[in-house]
From Swiss-Prot:
Organism: Bos taurus (Bovine)
Gene expressing this chain: WDR55
GO-annotated biological processes: rRNA processing
SMART domains (alphabetical): WD40 (SM00320)
Source organism, top-level taxon: Eukaryota
Subcellular location: Nucleus, Nucleolus; Cytoplasm
Residue ranges with Basic and acidic residues bias: 1-11
Function: Nucleolar protein that acts as a modulator of rRNA synthesis. Plays a central role during organogenesis.
Phosphoprotein listed as a keyword: yes
Name of the protein this chain belongs to: WD repeat-containing protein 55
Length: 382
């Protein structure tokens, strides 16, 4: 059993306390404690097998923490200050032995996870600041920069395997199909890009949307592609129809800055208003709030290897953990029957609305109740 799961199960254990014990038992929390940084985090990633969380901040520092539900046991293991400018993305290798980081300083770094030692540096990996990073397999990774450039790298070789520039603006996010053949890119030019990394060729760009595309993820077992945008709208594409959107729906948020899939139908979206919304795809609706960074934009989201926790980072310089149990157990149809028009967002974790009266008046998502109902009735089928 995973250590984190063991700790959570211990809350319900029946072991009797030792009457002679002098020390109070350690408190077991629902989630690990918040981690406070000295600067906002701009990159966030969980280890694929261990209870470790990596973060890169706007000062260029990289941190690795061990996390635990046992109070006082979430600790910094090491930090690295090798980047000269903001560290914008971090990712663990498939075996968890390396941490890859990219930066505004145009460099890619490979760090040893156990020791925090810099093992390799590609100093001028791009001609422009690097903004996004995606692991393809144990040897290959993809990077995207501020001018729309995409590069594919094999860690066993010196130069890039592929170098393309089809977008006119920054690469905000990237995703990969299950066969690891097609690379999908979300760009500031409002287009979804499709690149065949097996044949190392460009496939197509979608029609531009009215705002920047800020995030991209596959849903519905790869049949749908969801893109978040700077205008607070989620755009949906059919897998075989990347040229134009198949559907869209707006959240009451100025911008969707990051998204992470939780199940094949549910994703979490972080927004500039500080709220982390749980969103169901087909039928399309916001089902509640997982958590929040009080009035501070949510920059990054990551899901733990066991699926129990969502981690988030915001401008408040905190890394927060959210319990996913209630969201995973949610039945969307039941939620529809209980939903009250104009009511507040449903809390999907014990901490969802824990800190600020600002959120008490946050209303149900959508342009208005009538429009939301019309969208739901249209979107209930694939």
């Amino acid at each position: 059993m995973d250590r984190m799961c063991e700790e959570r199960a211990a809350e319900d254990g029946s072991d009797e306390e030792d009457p002679d014990a002098t020390e109070a038992p350690a408190r077991i929390r629902d989630t690990p404690e918040d981690i406070v940084l000295e600067a906002p985090a701009s990159g966030l990633a969980f280890h694929p097998a261990r209870d470790l969380l990596a973060a890169g901040d706007v000062d260029g520092d990289v941190f690795v923490f061990s996390y635990s539900c046992q109070e006082g046991e979430t600790k910094e293991l090491w930090s690295s200050g090798h980047h000269l400018k903001s560290c914008r993305a971090v990712v663990f290798s498939e075996d968890g032995q390396k941490l890859v980081t990219v930066s505004k300083d145009k460099a890619i770094h490979f760090l040893d996870v156990e020791l925090g030692r810099l093992e390799r540096r590609i100093s001028k990996a791009h001609g422009a600041p690097i903004n996004s990073l995606l692991l393809v397999d144990e040897n290959v990774l993809a990077t995207g920069d501020d001018t729309g450039g995409i590069r594919l790298w094999d860690q066993r070789k010196e130069g890039p395997l592929m170098d393309m520039r089809q977008h006119e603006e920054y690469i905000a996010d990237m995703a990969l199909d299950p066969d690891k053949k097609l690379l999908l890119t979300a760009s500031g030019d409002g287009c979804l890009g499709v690149f065949n990394i097996k044949r190392r060729r460009f496939e197509l760009l979608s029609e531009p949307q009215s705002g920047d595309l800020t995030s991209v993820t596959l849903m519905k077992y790869g049949r749908k592609v969801a893109c978040g945008s700077s205008e607070g709208t989620i755009y949906l594409f059919n897998w075989d129809g990347f040229g134009a959107t198949s559907d869209r729906f707006a959240l009451r948020a100025e911008s969707i800055d990051c998204m992470v899939p939780v199940t094949e139908s549910l994703l979490c979206a972080g927004s500039t208003d500080g709220v982390i919304r749980a969103v169901n795809i087909l039928p399309n609706r916001v089902v509640g709030s997982v958590g929040q960074h009080a009035e501070e934009p949510v920059e990054n989201l990551a899901l733990s290897h066991c699926g129990c926790f969502l981690a988030s980072s915001g401008h408040d310089q905190r890394l927060k953990f959210w319990d996913m149990a209630q969201l995973r157990a949610l039945v969307v149809d039941d939620y529809r029957r209980r939903k009250k028009k104009g009511g507040p967002l449903r809390a999907l974790s014990s901490k969802a609305w824990s800190t600020d009266d600002f959120f008490a008046g946050l209303r149900e998502e959508g342009e208005d109740a009538k429009t939301l109902e019309e969208e739901e009735s249209e979107d209930d089928s694939d």
